[in-house]
């Protein structure tokens, strides 16, 4: 296989499907299914959606935190949860009873605590993904990767939650296995678990891929999932959580106001916003990326294989459409200037039409 393609889309080392399989018991079926470099290139070429797997921090350290975290994904009992054995928890009484069993089996303290007893995971796909197929893929992924641990699933979809149109699955999983061992997921295992989710989606007819942001040429990050869901509100008492959320909001507003002022100032003065050291570094990385892409495409084309030629053509098309490397402030300034130019063109067009109308009226007289 192309060495450039491997560098562009590195493969993940195989990892055990579960975290409690002894070496002597491992077979090919005991490992997570990962993507090859060509699988990832094909996904980019076909512009398949990226499978999203978020591993939350292990901040659930006592029974109070656990109940509140599960209540959140259950929308206070309005969304039915599912257990690892596929049985349902249809309301607060059901999941409170289940969580009390966790408390007794793991000796979870009522309050306080210094060790993690559970963590949050989120699986997600773009709007329009078939809900039933998505749910089945999530169930399979959870059973494949989290067997040996207690967990509950909560599905937030357009049909169950008015607040979302993007299907996602919340998972609260115990961090203490049935054998008493504590969960540990390193970065390689996280990548392998994400790619296994792609395989599970494919099992139910949903095409997706899992690649690095750098390989895709993505620059601006979206709003962190921790900001969207404010996960830390579960890590302390209600009053402390409220104060924390307010402080974080004020901090974001101050930063946003500073960005807005810098954009307005640059727009009025007709100057550009200088690159930050981070943007300068990203531009250099973009150059390296495009050089590597060029080599990978050339190697695919040289193979003469019809499938490789399709992938090469798709990669060319994808990387041609990458947006410029710029900060959020720089992008806002560029869009403002584009809007100004478009408005000017529209105003010029209106003036020309009015002038033509006047000339026409003059001739008719």
Language-model region placement:
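N-terminal nicking endonuclease/strand-transfer module with a His-rich metal-binding environment
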Residues: 1-365
């Amino acid at each position: 296989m192309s060495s450039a393609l491997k560098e562009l889309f590195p493969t993940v080392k195989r990892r055990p499907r579960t975290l409690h399989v002894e070496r002597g018991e491992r077979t090919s079926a005991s490992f997570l299914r990962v993507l090859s470099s060509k699988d990832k290139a094909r996904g980019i070429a076909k512009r398949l959606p990226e499978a999203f797997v978020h591993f939350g921090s292990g901040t659930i350290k006592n029974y109070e935190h656990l109940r509140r975290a599960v209540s959140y994904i259950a929308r206070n009992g309005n969304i039915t949860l599912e257990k690892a054995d596929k049985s349902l928890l249809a309301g607060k009484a059901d999941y409170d009873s289940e969580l009390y069993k966790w408390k007794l089996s793991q000796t979870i303290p009522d309050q306080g605590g210094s060790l993690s007893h559970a963590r949050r995971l989120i699986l997600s796909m773009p709007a329009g993904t078939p809900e039933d197929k998505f749910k089945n893929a999530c169930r399979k992924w959870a059973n494949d990767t989290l067997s040996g641990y207690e967990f509950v699933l909560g599905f937030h979809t357009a049909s169950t939650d008015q607040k979302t149109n993007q299907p996602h699955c919340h998972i609260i999983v115990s961090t203490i296995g049935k054998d008493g061992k504590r969960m540990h997921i390193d970065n390689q295992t996280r990548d392998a678990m994400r790619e296994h989710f792609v395989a599970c989606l494919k099992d139910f007819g949903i095409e997706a891929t899992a690649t690095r942001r750098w390989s895709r040429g993505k620059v601006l990050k979206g709003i962190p999932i921790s900001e969207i869901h404010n996960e830390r509100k579960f890590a302390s008492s209600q009053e402390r959580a409220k104060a924390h959320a307010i402080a974080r909001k004020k901090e974001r507003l101050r930063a946003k106001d500073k960005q807005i002022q810098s954009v307005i100032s640059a727009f009025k003065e007709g100057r550009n916003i200088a690159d930050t050291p981070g943007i300068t570094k990203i531009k250099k990385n973009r150059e390296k990326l495009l050089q590597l892409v060029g080599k990978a495409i050339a190697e695919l084309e040289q193979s003469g294989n019809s499938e490789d030629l399709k992938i090469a053509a798709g990669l060319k098309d994808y990387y041609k459409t990458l947006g410029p490397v710029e900060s959020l402030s720089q992008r806002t300034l560029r869009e403002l200037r584009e809007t100004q130019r478009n408005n000017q063109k529209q105003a010029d067009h209106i003036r020309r039409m009015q002038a033509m109308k006047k000339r026409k009226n003059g001739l008719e007289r």
